[in-house]
Structures are given as C-alpha cells and as structure tokens.
A protein has these predicted regions:
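Short, acidic loop-to-helix structural element flanking the phosphoryl-transfer center
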Residues: 190-242
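Active-site neighborhood of HAD-like aspartate-dependent phosphohydrolases
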Residues: 128-176
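Hydrophobic, well-ordered beta-alpha structural blocks that scaffold small-molecule cofactor pockets
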Residues: 1-110
C-alpha cells in the first residue's frame, strides 16, 4: 500500500517517474502508483535490462533521458540510504526528486534536533585563565563536581518511598510532607537531613535520613570535566575547597566525594554544619578563613553560587548544570515531570550522560556533538533495547516450560542483557543465518520458489554459490533440467545438496534442543526465513518473538507463528522502521556469519568482512548499552519497569 504522504505528492506531480527496486513489494505497489502517474520503467542496482511485472528494467541514464521528474524507491530503509548515496548526485544535477513509499523526501538533509541555541556560551579557557589568577579554588558540590542520574531531585523521594514499601500513606502525601518539612526547617537557617525528618509526621522505627542518604549516594556520579579542572588546580598548587548548600554533614559529603574518586579537597563548607547557606553568610566565613587569598568560586546556580559569592567579595564563575544544558536545548520538548518514575529515570540517565560535560561550547556551532561510541550505546540505544528484552521476558512467562532460543548474530547482545536482567533464566544462543537456514532448509520446489523471490544481485553461478553453497564447476550437467526456467533448472542439485546440509544442521540443533519443550525463537528484524527453515529441523513447536517483522504477508501461508514488539500498525507510525538497521548493526556478535555446518554438526563460518575498527566500534557501543542496563537496575527494579516505546523512540531518533 502507498501512504497518504506519497499519494498527495503523486496527485500533484506533472511528469513521469521511475521506480527503484524489483522485489515483490514493487509488484504489489505498482498498480496503486500507476493510478496517479506514468511509470516509465524500473531501476535496479545490478541490472539495466530485461522486463519484470510488465515494465522494462532501465538504467538511471536512460530514465534521465526520458525526462522523469521523480524516483520512488521501494526498499527497506537501510537499502534506501545506500541507493540514495549512489544516485543522489545525478538526481540533484537533473532536478529529480527521490521519495520512499512512505512519501519521505530522501534527498532532504535532516537538521540537527539538539542545539544549544537558547544558552549563552562560555569557554573552558576563560575559566582556566581565572584559575591561574586565584590562590584558592572553591567548588560547589551538587550539579557541579557531581550530579544525580535522576530527572528531578524529587525522584529521590519516590525511590525512598518505593524502597521502604510505605503503605501507611500515599506517595503524594509522603513527597509533599518531605518537601514541606525541608522548606519549613530551612527558614532562617540551613538544616541537616535528620532535622528535616524529625519535623515530618511519619511513623517511627525507620531511619529515613540514613535511607535517603544511601539511595542518593547510589545515583550520584562525577562530572568528569569538572573533576579534571579540580585535579588541575591541585596539581598547580592551588588550595581546593568545597562550598555547598546541603542538608548532609561534612562527613557525608566527604563520603560522597570519596565514592566518586574525588580527592584533594582541603576543606568542606557544608551549610548544615554552619547553619547558614551561601546566600546567608557561608561565603563570609570562607572569606574570613582566607583573608589574604584570592578566591574563585565555581558553581551552577546564578543566585547562590554567582551573585552570593560576589556579594561576599569572592570572584565567581558560573557553569551550566546537566539540567541547565538539557532545558537549554530543543531536545524532547514534551517531557512531563509527572510521568512514571521509570521513565523519569531513563531521562535522568540520558541527561547525566549526554550533558555531563559543561564545556560544550568549544566548537563554533551550538549543536550537541556525540563523539564517544559508548555514549551512543548508553544514551540512545539502551532504553529501547532494554524495553524490548523486558517485553520478550514477559512473553516467555506466558509460555509454560518453554526454551528460549536467541538466534545469531543479533541474539549475542540480547543474551548478555538477559544474563544481567534475569540471571536465573536459561537461554540458548543458537547459531544461524539466512544463508545457513536456506542452504539446509530448501527441500522442495516451493522452497526454491520462496528463496528465488528474494531477488539476488548477481548471475546464476554466483547465486548458486552464495545462496546454496553449490560450486557450479562441480555440477553434474546430467542433473540440470533444461525443461525448466531460471533457478528451477538446478532443482535436483539444490535439493540434493540441501539434504546433506539439513542432516548436518540437525546434528548441531540436537545438541541444543530440549525435548518436549516448545521453542521461543528470537530474531531481531526479519521476515521469518530462519524460523521457517529451522522449523523443519526440530520436532518442537516454535513461536517467533521479534523486535520487528518485515513483510509479514510472505509468511501467511507458511504456518509459522510470529509476534513482534512493534506491531504492524505501530511500525507504520513509528520512526523505528527507518532506524532499525542501526540497532541491527550494534547487536551483532564478533564472529563471522555462519554459512553451514559440517558432518559433525560444527559451524562453518563465512569470511569476516568487517574491519577491526568496525568491531572496535561495535564493542564500545555494546559496552555503553550494558553499562546503562547495570545503572538502571541499580536504581530501579526491572520487575517494575513499564515499557514506554514512545519515550524510547524519542530518545533514539
């Protein structure tokens, strides 16, 4: 089906078009497209002659000579990008538009979504110059040297409520009491945490102050660039101190700093110890302690860190907190503070990672630039992958006594995540690939026809070799059936070879397969080809649990069961269909793809085509994803996680 966005364009086009792609989806879409516009021919990356679906296959140059106004690319998103890269220069030169079947303009450059246009820039070199002029460098603590992996400080109170399983009052009552008590005890002085809880109307028997402190410590991380500034100051012989508005004691602040490997602080001025804050005299005490020293204070709050320091005769330099940077961008504008806690934690992990560095203005542009592969995995990919694994586990709970098969190579990282989230669940990493499944599973003429529908970019000799593992130089010509057309000429040879590979593959699967247990089969993004052919090799019932199923209509007559994380309806509306190929690249293992199995049931791998730098990049992204998973469950129990695909997509896209 063509989509309304493309339909609108086709109605208004004044001229001819060509379609790029000769697969089954093209055949399906041609009649609808032809209702609106004249199709002059079909384009393909490997062929520029012949006829299919009633249209000539032509070259791009010929299409240009005919005078086409547009090209409609009917292919998967990853293929669309590769096609556009190949043809965009000629199309731009000849004013030819390129659209996909969804109506997206494929020549349109995507603009950066995340810019710092709202914020006034500052530069690290300016701060370092000010440091050179000072004797004592004072650092704010929270949001400066350290930050919380939370969307809001108030999320801490909800975490405390959940941890203590408080049923005597509602969450809202608890949070309101906690905030109200902090505000009332702060009037005229700087309270400590015990005093705040003493004024709360809570039942006794629990040390709320200690429990809150423990949770807070668990969600605090360093702001790396500012810790580097601190270490620079110490190495230059400057005296480093901390001046902080806090309800924690000096001892507790020191404990937090030590836990985050922040050392070398000569003195900590905690407002709770002096019963006064930065705006009520704490800086005056600092000034008095260093009467003849030039002091520079670094902090994130304009009033308490910048204005109050200057008022006390102390130079000050304001930096942005992670929260400042987040709200200063145009990223995810519809984030709401009243969303579910697990979603807020996702955003908190994102903010504390992406905006950890306060010195983001070193480039001329104000775009946020991610140059660390681990950050890509941690902040952008991990939330969606974690939610998928949670969904997958929920589906396995619906199946009594099932075995879990995580198919290669996409199942490699999924298995690692499973072992972190559900360490007591047994999973099997199953070696397979579309090539291995086809070579061992093509046992009938119908199977050959199914495989032949997947258009192959090469001649017959190459097709036989790559798809079926058959060396044309070793073929007995007596087995070639000249009464048939195309690939069916080699039917006898293909099926004969497949039976050998089938028996070898079965030996491998027998080592894994648990008798009398249904199989839940993971594939990431697929039509179902591997599952279809593997189903022939095991007696067990198989149900597929996919991230996304492509072209499900091709499996309608194959009697295989597949359920997807993203439904067909969601896929149409979702941006994930445009971006899944990125995730597919990331999930992979570090072994080459398996081609087939030997007589002992051992894998025979294809030649590795990825470069070392490609594998290094994948490793770093995967490390980021695994770190995110560990950080999330440290803060929030996976059992209570509610899947939020909308938020995951916002983050990824």
């Amino acid at each position: 089906m063509i989509f309304k966005k493309l339909e609108k364009y086709l109605k208004n086009i004044d001229g001819k078009i060509a379609i790029y792609g000769i697969g089954k989806e093209t055949e399906k879409n041609i009649p609808e497209i032809n209702e609106y516009v004249e199709i002059v021919g079909l384009l393909d990356g490997f062929r520029d002659n012949g006829n299919i679906y009633g249209y000539n296959i032509i070259s791009l140059n010929k299409a240009i000579k005919i005078g086409i106004k547009a090209i409609i690319v009917i292919a998967r998103p990853g293929s669309c990008r590769a096609i556009v890269t190949r043809i965009k220069d000629k199309c731009n030169e000849n004013n030819i538009k390129i659209y996909d079947v969804y109506g997206n303009n494929l020549l349109e450059e995507k603009q950066s979504k995340c810019t710092l246009g709202k914020l006034k820039p500052y530069y690290k070199k300016d701060l370092m110059n000010k440091i050179e002029e000072a004797d004592v460098i004072s650092f704010d603590c929270f949001n400066t040297l350290i930050t919380r992996q939370l969307f809001s400080r108030y999320d801490l109170f909800e975490l405390l409520y959940n941890k203590l399983s408080l049923t005597e009052m509602s969450l809202k009552e608890f949070v309101n009491q906690r905030i109200k008590s902090e505000k009332s005890t702060a009037i005229g002085l700087a309270p400590n945490l015990k005093k705040i809880y003493e004024d709360c109307v809570f039942f006794s028997g629990i040390d709320f102050a200690e429990e809150e402190f423990k949770i807070d410590k668990s969600v605090i991380i360093r702001r790396e660039e500012l810790v580097e500034v601190l270490n620079y100051c110490i190495n230059k012989g400057k005296e480093a101190i901390v001046v902080t508005d806090t309800y924690y004691s000096e001892k507790q602040i020191k404990s937090i700093l030590n836990d985050n490997s922040i050392y070398g602080i000569k003195k900590i001025y905690a407002s709770s110890e002096y019963t006064r804050g930065k705006d009520t005299g704490l800086f005056d005490i600092v000034k008095k302690d260093y009467p003849k020293k030039k002091i520079l204070h670094i902090g994130d709050d304009y009033l308490s860190d910048y204005k109050s320091a200057i008022k006390s005769g102390i130079n000050s330099y304001k930096i942005y907190s992670c929260e400042d940077l987040f709200y200063g961008t145009n990223f995810m504008p519809d984030v709401e503070p009243d969303m579910e806690l697990d979603s807020k934690i996702k955003i908190g992990l994102f903010i504390s990672n992406i905006f950890n560095n306060p010195f983001v203005f070193e480039r001329l542009e104000k775009d946020i630039c991610i140059q660390n592969n681990k950050t890509i995995g941690y902040s952008f990919c991990a939330p969606l992958i974690m939610d998928f694994v949670k969904w997958f586990e929920e589906k396995t709970r619906e199946c009594n006594d099932c075995q879990i098969w995580l198919s290669a190579r996409d199942g490699y990282l999924i298995k690692k995540i499973y072992e972190i989230l559900y360490p007591n669940r047994k999973t099997h990493y199953v070696l397979t690939s579309r090539t291995a499944a086809i070579r061992a599973g093509t046992l009938s003429e119908d199977d050959i026809a199914y495989v032949d529908d997947m258009k192959f970019g090469g001649n017959m000799d190459l097709c036989l070799k790559k798809r079926f593992g058959i060396d044309v130089n070793k073929i007995d010509i007596k087995q070639i059936d000249d009464t048939q057309q195309g690939i069916l000429k080699y039917k006898e040879i293909i099926i004969g070879e497949a039976w050998k590979k089938y028996l070898n593959y079965k030996k491998y699967l027998k080592k894994i397969c648990e008798k009398n247990k249904n199989i839940l089969f993971f594939d990431f993004v697929a039509k179902g080809t591997c599952q279809f052919f593997i189903k022939k090799m095991v007696p067990n019932k198989i149900k597929g649990l996919y991230f996304l199923q492509l072209e499900p209509q091709y499996m309608n007559d194959k009697q295989i069961q597949i359920e997807s994380f993203f439904s067909e309806r969601e896929k149409i509306k979702s941006t994930i269909y445009q971006d899944y190929y990125i995730l597919e690249t990331i999930l992979t293992s570090f072994s080459p793809s398996v081609n087939e199995f030997n007589i002992s049931g051992e894998p025979i791998y294809a030649e590795e085509t990825r470069l070392k730098e490609d594998l290094d990049c994948i490793y770093e992204v995967q490390s980021g994803i695994l770190n995110y998973i560990k950080d999330f469950i440290k803060i929030y129990p996976i059992e209570q996680l509610k899947i939020n695909k909308k938020l995951d997509e916002q983050i990824l896209s």
